[in-house]
C-alpha cells in the first residue's frame, strides 16, 4: 500500500465514523432558558453572532443594526447613537455562535438575557443552543416594534413554552423532523409542517403546566401563526448532531457552514477549530419589482447548519412548495439531488 492509498483509507474510515455520528444523533428539546444561564462561557457585555469571526469595522449593515438592537434590548445603552459608540469602542466582545455550541438565524445575535432553545443530543450527551427566529431584529432592525418582539419572547412566550417542555420531560425532535420532511418541509426556508407539529405537541403540556391564561393565549397565538418557528429548532438539532462529528482525525466531513454577511466560512472535522473563509456571496433569488441582486446584502446566518447535516437545499426536490419563493425550479432541485447522489456514489466506489 502506498502512502497515498494509506491516507485515503484513513480518510474513508474517518468519514464513515463522522457520518455515523451525525446519523445516530438523537436531538431532544430539553429547555428554553436565558442564554447567560445555559451557554458555557457566555459573559456579560458579549454578543454572539452568525458566521466566522468578524469585528465591528468589517460587519455588514444588517449585522451592525442587529448588534445595536441587542445593546438596546439589554439596556446597555439608551439610544442607537450610544449603542453604536459602545459597540465601536471595543467594550462589547464579539464571538461566533459556533464557538459556544450555538447557532443563530441571519445576524444570529445572542446575549445573556435572550432565551435560547436548549437541545440535547441524547446519543452523545452534548448540547446546542439557538435563539428565537423572528423577522425584524435578526435582519438589522432596532426599532421599538423589533425590540418589543424580543421582550415578548423573553417575558411571555419563552417562559410559557419552557413550562410545557419541562412538563413533558423534553420533546424528541427527530420524529418531528422525519414527519416534516415527508410533508413538504426542507427545514431551512420551509418549516410549516414542523412548526405545526411542534405547536400541537406543546399546547396540551402548557395547559397542564398551569400557564396563566393571558400568557397561554398569547403563546398559542404566537406558535400557531409562526411558520418559521421550527427553524430555530432544526438549527439547534443540526448543531447538536454535527458537533460530535468534529475533531475526528483524517475526516474531511464539513461540520459547520456559516455566513456573517461579510464572509462565508466552513469547518472540517479533521482540521480542528480552524475556519476556512471566502467572501460571502449575494443570493441569486427572487427580488421585489425594481430590485436586483445589486441591491442585496451578502449572504448571512448560521442556518446553513441544516444543509451541513443533509437537510435544506439537499432535500429541496421534496419541498416543491418552497421553489417559487427561493427562485428555483423542480429541474434544478433534482439536479442538486442527483449531484449529491453522484458524489456519494463516487465516495463509496
Walk through the language-model features, giving the residues of each.
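Structured, contiguous alpha/beta core segments that scaffold functional sites
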Residues: 112, 119-197
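Single conserved hydrophobic/aromatic residue that forms the stacking wall/gate
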Residues: 339-348
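Alpha-helical support elements that line or immediately flank enzyme active sites
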Residues: 316-328
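An N-terminal, globular interaction/scaffold subdomain
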Residues: 24-146
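Conserved phosphate/anionic-ligand binding catalytic regions in large, soluble enzymes, centered on
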Residues: 302-317
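Accessory "access/gating" subregions that flank catalytic or transport cores
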Residues: 191-299
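Intrinsically disordered, low-structural-confidence terminal and linker regions
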Residues: 1-19
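Beta-strand segments within the central parallel beta-sheet cores of soluble alpha/beta enzyme folds
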Residues: 331-338
Amino acid at each position: 500500500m502506498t502512502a497515498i492509498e494509506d491516507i485515503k483509507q484513513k480518510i474513508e474510515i474517518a468519514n464513515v465514523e463522522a457520518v455515523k455520528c451525525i446519523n445516530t444523533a438523537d436531538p431532544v428539546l430539553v429547555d428554553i432558558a436565558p442564554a447567560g444561564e445555559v451557554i458555557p462561557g457566555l459573559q456579560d457585555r458579549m454578543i454572539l453572532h452568525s458566521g466566522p469571526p468578524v469585528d465591528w469595522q468589517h460587519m455588514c449593515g444588517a449585522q451592525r443594526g442587529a448588534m445595536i438592537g441587542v445593546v438596546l434590548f439589554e439596556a446597555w445603552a439608551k439610544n442607537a447613537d450610544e449603542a453604536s459608540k459602545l459597540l465601536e469602542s471595543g467594550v462589547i466582545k464579539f464571538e461566533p455562535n459556533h464557538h459556544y455550541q450555538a447557532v443563530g438565524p441571519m445576524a444570529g445575535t445572542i446575549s445573556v438575557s435572550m432565551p435560547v432553545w436548549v437541545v440535547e443530543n441524547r446519543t452523545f450527551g452534548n448540547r446546542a443552543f439557538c435563539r428565537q427566529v423572528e423577522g425584524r431584529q435578526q435582519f438589522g432592525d432596532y426599532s421599538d416594534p423589533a425590540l418589543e418582539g424580543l421582550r415578548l419572547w423573553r417575558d411571555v412566550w419563552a417562559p410559557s413554552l419552557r413550562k410545557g417542555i419541562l412538563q413533558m420531560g423534553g420533546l424528541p425532535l427527530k420524529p418531528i423532523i422525519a414527519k416534516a420532511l415527508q410533508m413538504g418541509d426542507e427545514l431551512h426556508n420551509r418549516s410549516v409542517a414542523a412548526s405545526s407539529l411542534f405547536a400541537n405537541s406543546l399546547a396540551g403540556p402548557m395547559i397542564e403546566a398551569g400557564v396563566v391564561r393571558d400568557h397561554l393565549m398569547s403563546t398559542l397565538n404566537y406558535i400557531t401563526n409562526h411558520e418559521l418557528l421550527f427553524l430555530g429548532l432544526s438549527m439547534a438539532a443540526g448543531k447538536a448532531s454535527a458537533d460530535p462529528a468534529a475533531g475526528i482525525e483524517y475526516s474531511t466531513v464539513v461540520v459547520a457552514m456559516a455566513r456573517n454577511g461579510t464572509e462565508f466560512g466552513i469547518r472540517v472535522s479533521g482540521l480542528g477549530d480552524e475556519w476556512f473563509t471566502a467572501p460571502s456571496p449575494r443570493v441569486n433569488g427572487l427580488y421585489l419589482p425594481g430590485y436586483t441582486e445589486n441591491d442585496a446584502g451578502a449572504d448571512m446566518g448560521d442556518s446553513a447548519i441544516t444543509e451541513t447535516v443533509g437537510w435544506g437545499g439537499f432535500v429541496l426536490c421534496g419541498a416543491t412548495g418552497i421553489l417559487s419563493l427561493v427562485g428555483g425550479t423542480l429541474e434544478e432541485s433534482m439536479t442538486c439531488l442527483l449531484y449529491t447522489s453522484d458524489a456519494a456514489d463516487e465516495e463509496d466506489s
